[in-house]
Amino acid sequence: NLDVQRGSITALIGPNGAGKTTVFNCLTGFYRASGGNILFTSRNKTTNVIQVLGQKFQPGDWINPAQFGQRLFYKMFGGTHLVNRAGLARTFQNIRLFREMSVVENLLVAQHMRVNRNLLAGIVNSPAYRRAESDALDRAFYWLEVVDLVDCANRLAGEMSYGQQRRLEIARAMCTGPEMICLDEPAAGLNPVETHKLSSIIRFLRDHHDITVLLIEHDMGMVMEISDDIIVLDHGDVIARGKPAQIQHDEKVIAAYLGTDESEVTL
């Protein structure tokens, strides 16, 4: 059982193979959970992630037309786009940018669900279409400013340094207009200066945009510095959760990381 408080920075930590990325993949629809519930409560509504991805038909569906119709609808039209539309975005362990596109083009593509793409409006270049295009560009440059990449707007994404690409991924995710963002090892491979800059960006998301951040990270210094809450996984189970100061001295957590029994841990 795992829950994340709105407007917080919550770190999901644990040894390699604990199931952290699997949790992200289930939350965002890249894996389809075989059971249980994944509920994402935004400001406007609650989305059942498993449901909108398209669940298997159940025997009881045949005697419940409404339930059958709902399940059939999501089977036909459901998918990860509905998870994103509900307000959930993510980044990946391995950077996944459109490398042959410019930096700003990466951010414009991310807004395809928010921009008026009506074919007729585009053909006649209507005022609404031009306004939507202008708003998308303004939004892209706003997030480029937040991640300190305005000067790189017209460079190819594939030509950027590793640290810059990491920040661009966050900007691209934010252009989808999420209420919650899942960051999968965003500081991996970064030097201390880049990690500090990244930490400032993550705090900015929480403090100025009320974004809920769920973070997987192996840099314990960063985790302890920026997290409001920490959840610790080991072999797929939550073994501890609490404030950073509590987690630092939790015997179960120390045992999991050191590969020892709790009885062998001396604090």
Describe these PLM feature segments.
Residues 1-267:
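Glycine-rich phosphate-binding loops of nucleotide-dependent enzymes
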